[in-house]
Amino acid sequence: WEGGKHPIKVAPYTRSMLDTYRNNVTACLILSTSKEKGSFDVAATDKFLYALAPLPFATGLFPLALGEEIGIEFLPAVKEAVNMSFSERNKLGFKMAMKKDLGFFFGLGSVAYAVSLSLSSLTNGGGGGGVKLSSLMQCKPHMILRLLQAKRRCKKENRAMLPKDLFHLKGFMVAGTDNLCYKEDLEELWGIRPMELFAGTEPSIMGTETWTRKGMYFFPDTAFYEFITEKDMMRNYEDPSYIPSTYLMDEVRPGEKYELVFTILKGGAFARYRCGDMYRCVGLENREDETRIPRFE
């Protein structure tokens, strides 16, 4: 992040914050595989496509924190990926996925979309990174069969091969403020609807959708949450001397848009911090996932 008076935005993290972060990203990983209550599918042998910006960017914490809880393999390995360019990571990750298969994918909405298009290009032999006959012998038998079936199906349907033709993801997660712009396209490319997360430099990870993919719930152990109505936020921008009222989680109303205000727990440095993000309350309960707490988008 660059701009304003300071070239880099940084935020301090305590060990307790990192422990909470680890627990919550693990919960997100599990939830991303779920289609209904009590149905999960995560194994230590699963493979994870590395499509994240490395440290000091906040996304660089994800593989490190997850590695403390479960030994999922990243493609390519984190130690190698951090020293590669975006294009190099995509090409190597694709080649490794063809050999080992792929179970998970996580990235910022726009970045995930760019990676997906890059994989589609590689799948169809573009960019010099396509699957060559010489490398097929190194692939698992079921991946060779899947590739042959995908080529036949795509030829019959007269279309280009997509990532979903080769990889059957268990879980797909996206974060960022532009997710809504890419969700439909990402679902078409991968054959699975991405689960949206709320994360940022200052708060770490704060919220996630469930198997219903119908709004995010905030993690109660990450921060204390307050909300400013859109009307009051705009008035405050026009008149900086105006102090807007804040509302608590049990005071938000469905359909209303709010600016999020949070106080980081576990020794964080941000108290009643306004990050500028806006969220709409989409409901106070959801029968599908049996919740009675507000959810947002």
Residue ranges of each PLM-predicted region?
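General structural concept
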Residues: 13-20
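Conserved adenylation A10 loop of the ANL superfamily
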Residues: 1-10
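Alpha-helical packing segments of well-folded alpha/beta enzyme cores
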Residues: 20-28, 93, 182
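Conserved AMP-binding loop of ANL adenylate-forming enzymes
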Residues: 25-75, 79-84
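Active-site glycine/GP-rich loop and adjacent strand/helix microenvironment
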Residues: 65-297
